[in-house]
Regions:
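Non-transmembrane, aqueous-exposed alpha-helical and coiled segments at domain scale
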Residues: 1-156, 161-277
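Cofactor-/ligand-binding subdomain signature composed of acidic, glycine-rich
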Residues: 276, 282, 302
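Short, structured beta-strand/loop micro-motifs enriched in basic residues and often containing a Trp
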Residues: 280-292
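Short, well-ordered loop/turn sites that connect or cap secondary structure elements
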Residues: 299-300, 306
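Short, charged beta-turn/beta-strand-edge "cap" motif at the junction between a beta-strand
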Residues: 305, 311-315
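Short, compositionally biased
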Residues: 314-325
Length: 325
């Protein structure tokens, strides 16, 4: 009930897009991302193979057979580079030392937009009081902006034994991979979810006014705040998001078989019976000339929804420019 017209418009449009994507032919987002695999291999699991190579082969075949966009650019020198034409290399991290006979996987397709909205801030203990931390978060929430396609799944990690550990924690938390962490610390220095600060950050995001791309309340779906141990002289803080496409899935291989997380296959059940009631968008005919278009636009605030018709010249960004190389 508190959603703005723009919030409603974005939510409804995204649900319609999900219904199309659920048919398995067109992806939710044309940026089908860097393929990331985070795996934990039980100490009793023996494959007799180059696991990373096998996973990379699966990435290659999937992107080729499903006609997904190739986004990886490979360098030949510091200056010269070209699209790999396969979406390889993938990021594959395999960890061992876990007891048992299970091979667990988290697969993420991370688009450039959400990856670019990953930030590391090197802070100190001076940040660790309610007033300073609240001010810091209010300030840096605006670093996210809207170019990574909100509503976001927002993750914040405060602390970490290293900068890379802090950043890795944020990536996993934004995918919901750390949801089962404990909710309090201990003398052993375990990481934990701070549920109180998750509520505080959620409130900050809703009151920011940024909204779901065009102003409003729903900048984020949800928030994960992870507190981690740190070196006494350091306090890394990482902020990152999973975008509205939110493409991640868990899997595991056990002696009983192969198991894949079941995702929603019928998003249409979330659609309202009727489109949400919204104020009409402003109609603009681009063929009437830029002077007239500008005169119309100056009458309306930023965040006004527009219906454009006429000749539209599209400037392709650098990611798309590399695809045909």
């Amino acid at each position: 009930p508190e959603a703005t017209d723009n919030d409603k418009f974005v939510a409804y449009t995204m649900l319609l897009n999900q219904c199309v994507a659920a048919e398995g032919e067109l992806p939710t987002c044309q940026d089908t991302g860097t393929a990331i695999c985070i795996a934990h291999k039980g100490e009793d699991v023996w494959t007799g193979a180059d696991d990373a190579r096998c996973i990379a082969r699966g990435v290659y075949e999937t992107y080729k057979e499903r006609n997904l966009r190739y986004s990886q650019v490979v360098p030949f020198s510091m200056i010269d580079e070209k699209n790999s034409g396969t979406n390889l290399p993938a990021q594959i991290d395999i960890y061992g030392g876990k007891p048992g006979m299970e091979y667990e996987f988290l697969f993420i397709t991370k688009g450039g937009g959400s990856a670019n909205k990953t930030f590391l801030y090197q802070q100190t203990k001076a940040l660790l009081n309610e007033e300073s931390l609240t001010k810091f978060i209010k300030q840096h929430i605006f670093d996210l902006g809207t170019s990574a396609c909100p509503p976001y799944h927002l993750a914040i990690c405060i602390g970490g034994t290293s900068a890379e550990m802090c950043l890795s924690t944020v990536k996993k938390a934004s995918a919901g991979y750390l949801d089962e962490l404990p909710t309090s610390g201990n003398e052993g220095g375990r990481c934990f979810r701070d549920l109180e600060w998750e509520e505080k950050v959620l409130k900050i995001c809703r009151e920011s006014g940024v909204g779901a791309q065009f102003g409003g309340k729903y900048l984020v779906h949800d928030v994960r705040v992870i507190r981690a141990p740190r070196h006494a002289a350091s306090c890394p803080v990482a902020i990152g998001v999973s975008c509205s496409a939110d493409r991640n899935i868990k899997a595991k291989i056990t002696p009983e078989g192969i198991f894949l997380e079941q995702l929603e296959k019928n998003p249409a059940r979330f659609l309202p019976k009727e489109a949400p009631a919204m104020s009409p968008a402003v109609d603009i005919d681009l063929d009437e000339g830029m002077d007239k278009v500008r005169a119309i636009l100056t009458k309306y605030p930023i965040k006004t929804r527009l219906n454009l018709r006429g000749t539209l010249i599209v400037a392709r960004d650098i990611a798309h420019a590399r695809i045909k190389q």
